[in-house]
Amino acid sequence: MLSSQTSSIFTVSRLNQTVRLLLEQEMGQVWISGEISNFTQPASGHWYFTLKDDTAQVRCAMFRNSNRRVTFRPQHGQQVLVRANITLYEPRGDYQIIAESMQPAGEGLLQQKYEQLKAKLQAEGLFDQQHKQPLPSPAHCVGVITSKTGAALHDILHVLKRRDPSLPVIIYPTAVQGDDAPGQIVRAIELANARGECDVLIVGRGGGSLEDLWSFNDERVARAIFASRIPVVSAVGHETDVTIADFVADLRAPTPSAAAEIVSRNQQELLRQIQSAQQRLGMAMDYYLANRSRRFTQIFHRLQQQHPQLRLARQQTALERLRQRMGFALEARIKQANQRQQCVSQRLSQQNPQPRIHRAQSRIQQLEYRLTENIRSRLSEQRERFGNAVTHLEAVSPLATLARGYTVSTTTDGKVLKKIKQVKAGDIMTTRLEDGWLESEVKSVTPGT
């Protein structure tokens, strides 16, 4: 009987070897959770310990080249998650596991799920920059998806009220923690998209542990954010908290308060920009008028240096054209300033900062009135100077001298007769009077005494 079954008889060594190969080949690498006990670390640097639960235990070894990658010091009674290979120690026939990695259970398990989902969604392209939607600038209505009783909502509303009190805010209250939270967050995102009331959404909550923030690592929430037609700003926890929602969102804010800062405009800054624009407009007008005044002065000096009537008439015509161009340019600038002011007023009216806008408009009107009066005064002054110049030029004109009874006599070769030695008896000379010329013959020359 024994002789017929000798081929099935194992030695102890062969049995242990066969069992080891079966365990290693069939089981492969597995994840095991349990409580650490009997932890030791000899001089070799290897770790030896037992993993147990309420009803069973198994011996474990973790060699030095693997345990040096563990980021914490295992303690007796600590719950851990171990990735290990199943094997058999042949000399004693002891079944054991060889650990390759170790992490705390609870958060460690969640971290593993987090990494797996992150890798999956990244492979699908949900994190790609090409899918990110730009945020509206400025936002006309902000939707907030968070708990209606949490500190995050209070922080968001406080920042929005401080920066842009006229900005409409719609709250879509949801749970942000617990088993029902992911579904509620998804429904809130879908509702906001269906109603189309907002042009940007803030999705988030305050800080907490990994378990507290786990709703924002849910695949359903990630896909709802990715599918949203409205740009989404994630604002989950603190700056060091990074969730799957942060990777999928169009923009990640480090905190809920920072998200409110991002989607809102600072009205104080807007008013400073308006005041700066007014100042630049005033400086431009002053420069324009000063430049035209210098040009007018140059023309006036040139008129003084040239002979009167014909050139004076041409310059007067050119001056009139210049005045008209100045008037047209001024009207165009004022019209442009009015248009800009109306545009700014219209934009501000949508944000409802009425008292400040009224004050700004009143200031602009005062500046326009003062500018117009200043230009009129300068034009009147220049006209007066121009009239005085004409009067002066007419006073020194040779024609005016003739009109007072004086005459100018010239010899036959056209030279002006200044002394008697230029003529002699019998010479012919021409005399210019106010209304014409006469020709006379010199009868005699008598020197003066």
Curated annotation (Swiss-Prot):
One of its GO terms (biological process) is DNA catabolic process. One of its GO terms (cellular component) is exodeoxyribonuclease VII complex. It comes from the Bacteria. The keyword Repressor does not apply. Its EC number is 3.1.11.6. Pfam families: Exonuc_VII_L (PF02601), tRNA_anti_2 (PF13742). It catalyses: Exonucleolytic cleavage in either 5'- to 3'- or 3'- to 5'-direction to yield nucleoside 5'-phosphates. Signal peptide: none annotated. One of its GO terms (molecular function) is exodeoxyribonuclease VII activity. Keywords: Cytoplasm, Exonuclease, Hydrolase, Nuclease. It is found in: Cytoplasm. Heterooligomer composed of large and small subunits. Bidirectionally degrades single-stranded DNA into large acid-insoluble oligonucleotides, which are then degraded further into small acid-soluble oligonucleotides. Belongs to the XseA family. This is Exodeoxyribonuclease 7 large subunit. It comes from Salmonella typhimurium (strain LT2 / SGSC1412 / ATCC 700720).
